[in-house]
Amino acid sequence: MKGLVLSGGGLKGAYQIGAYKALKKLKYDFQIVTGTSIGAINGAFITAKQYQKAVTLWENAQIDFLFTEKLNENLIVLEYIRNMIENKGMNVEALKSNINKYLSKKKFFKSEIKYGLVTVNKKTLKPKYISKEELNEDNLVDYLMASSCFYPVFQSKKIENDEYVDGGYHDNMPIDFAIKLGADEIIAIDLEAIGIRKKVQGKAKIKYIRPNNNLGPEMIVSNKQIRKNLCYGYNDTMKAFNKLEGKKYTFKKNELEKYLKFYKDKYEQLARKKKKDYQLTKEELRRIIESTCTILKIDDTKIYTIKKINNIIKKQVEQKGFFKEELKNINKKKITFAINDKIALYISII
């Protein structure tokens, strides 16, 4: 059976929903979903087959979407510290209300998908692995909150007579839980966030999807970053399955190979004129293009053709005067082949 495992990672979690969009496009059906912290919340929406509701929840995320108290966004770290001292953490009942608003419990329990989450008993520090069969409509959202309570930044979650904290304190990527539920083929979406990693003990074919770009802080609410993370998740997943290419930037499939043939001779001939024995490979072409885009601060969420990105590069260089000295040096036969000189050489042939 196919399993989807979602790590914890706070406000980086939109990445997982973007990744799931790609998996849907690739016709992946999962029989098992497990998650920790934000991964547990995302996993509940996926189990309920409410992908679009999850997107809406993330796109609407603002500071008051999470916290009951009115906070100064510019001093959010100080607000966290103040609440840790005065209130034993932030009150996140607003998040609970919004999960209740968007997540259909009926669809969750009607779904044939097996589900599991992880939380930790605050007093005993023992983990609690909870499967769908142990949940009901009354306690589902409470346990989602328990798995996500990043104590002491957030208040712990009391359920019946026990208090619970974030499952990431024990198992931030519950792969073995998915195997226990029956998964033998797993896609694990790793936010590379703070949390305990367990060495996988069970046997399963595992494919990891990890971010190529910076997803921003785990605890700072930025709607702009959230929307970027949705794109990053989609792009990285399509790259992981060889449907797109690139690393920090994203290009349509086979674009780099196509343009390598077009530029290779020109680039190497010009390099030889500068007395540099230089070979242009596909990987080096990618690195030069992406380095250029990074310096020029070109949008890294979009999917480009090389022709399109070259036009943007040329326009930016003309308008802003980037690499002016390096381009002059090429004309004067002064070239070191530091990355900026490689970029200038590339710009001169596109």
Stretch-by-stretch model annotation:
Residues 1-36, 44-350:
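Patatin-like phospholipase
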